[in-house]
Amino acid sequence: VKDSVYVGNAGKDAALDRGWILGHFKDVGDPRHSEAVEIKWGVHPRADARSQWVRGEERTALLVLISGRFRVELPGRSVLLEEQGDYVVWGRGVDHSWFAEEESVVLTVRWPSVPGYAAAEKDQSHPRT
């Protein structure tokens, strides 16, 4: 049972893998390995932005604001998350980008967990963002 349990701290563990705490990119055998879902604890300084839009999205995503002010850009629409617990969900085929209006912490859940979506090096998010 010990091998199928992992106890950690999202902030500390996220810092080790550019925010990602669960998904296909964790080692097989690690309870945090999953091809079904991926989870990110994103800590973003004020004015942090995704370096380029994600296009041809194959996943569904949920982004929940933990703290701060965070804007998600979607085709033809901008969504501003301002209160703790505000969230946005977008489905497959919806391109997106984001911008931290203030220092922000967001929790992102995406499914399924698939490789790809690399952003330019300037991006402080994980390549799977």
Report each predicted region and the residues it spans.
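A short, N-terminal "cap"/entry segment at the start of jelly-roll beta-barrel domains
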Residues: V1-R46, R50-W53, K122-T129
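Double-stranded beta-helix
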Residues: D3-Y6, F99-T129
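Short histidine-centered beta-strand/loop micro-motifs
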Residues: G29-P31, R50-E57, L74, L80-L81, ...
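Conserved hydrophobic/aromatic positions in well-ordered beta-strands
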Residues: K40-G42, L63, L107
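Short, conserved beta-strand element in jelly-roll/cupin
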Residues: R55-V72
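Short, surface-exposed beta-edge/turn micro-motifs
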Residues: R59-L62, G85, E103-S104
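Structural motif
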Residues: R69, D95, E103-V105
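Short acidic-glycine-tyrosine-enriched beta hairpin
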Residues: G76-G93
